[in-house]
Amino acid sequence: EQTGVPVKVVTAASGTYDTTLAAELDKSSAPTLFQCGNQGAINSYGDYCYPFDGTAIMDQMTTDAFNLKGEDGQTLAIGYCYEAFGIIVNKALLEKAGHSIDEITNFESLKAVADDIHARADELGFDAFSSAGLEGSSSWRFSGHLANMPLYYEFRDDGVTAQPATITGAYLENFKNIWDLYTTDSATTGAALATATGDESEAELGEGKAAFYQNGTWEYSNLSGTFNMNPDDLAMIPIYCGVEGEEKAGLCAGTEN
């Protein structure tokens, strides 16, 4: 309710949010607002989080499905931005290669299209997937987002509703399916993946050097603005990994908290 209050905004460099937050919270003037994007962050920083239960903003929320809670059940982080991730597609490049996004409905059809583009990369002037770099600014796409795929299907089958102590790994082969495709049907393979960055992967799609790029809706402004991509050429498909019935799958969706 008070206006005119000076606010200092600290922006962490790419891939350094966790270390930056830890350093800021250790200061006498710790942050008033900060992000806890997953349960791991709640475990690390929950003691600094003021519970939202009983506040006006909680009364305004239509669902608490995306909120994060502490061990005592208190709501410690709430969703403020709804977003989705999957495989971003340059439809114009697909068409140039003689394919259509409509023919991709599962892992088998995705692999067929990607294999064909990769085999003709020199002729086409672009490859199938942008680099799946393992440098810190890129690796979170796979250690976090991609890892959701086998976990989602396992938890769905087993009726898991809370963090389990162990996993069965029932769908780890499916994780391997899509990871192998990312790292095979790409111009960046092998040892080069260790140092390939997130910016490089983004630029490969943005500059028309790759047809597929795993990331999320937050990439729209960079791709349409920085790289001047035609919005009509952009689409996103689910991350297919060879699970039965995935033809009916949608995008992975959630919130920043």
Predicted regions and their residues:
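Glycine-centered hinge/linker elements that transmit conformational signals in sensory
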Residues: 114-115, 160-195
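Extracytoplasmic/periplasmic solute-binding protein
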Residues: 76-80, 85, 111-164, 210
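Extracytoplasmic/periplasmic substrate-recognition and gating elements
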Residues: 2, 95-97, 187, 226-257
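Extracytoplasmic "Venus flytrap"/periplasmic binding protein-like
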Residues: 2-64, 92-98, 105, 203-204, ...
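A local structural motif
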Residues: 3-12, 98-102, 181-196, 209, ...
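Hinge/lid segment of periplasmic solute-binding proteins
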Residues: 37-89, 145-147, 235-237, 245-247
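Beta->alpha turn/N-cap motifs
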Residues: 35-40, 198, 215-220, 239
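Short, solvent-exposed loop/beta-turn-alpha elements that line the ligand-binding surface or hinge
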Residues: 53-65, 103-105, 129, 133-136, ...
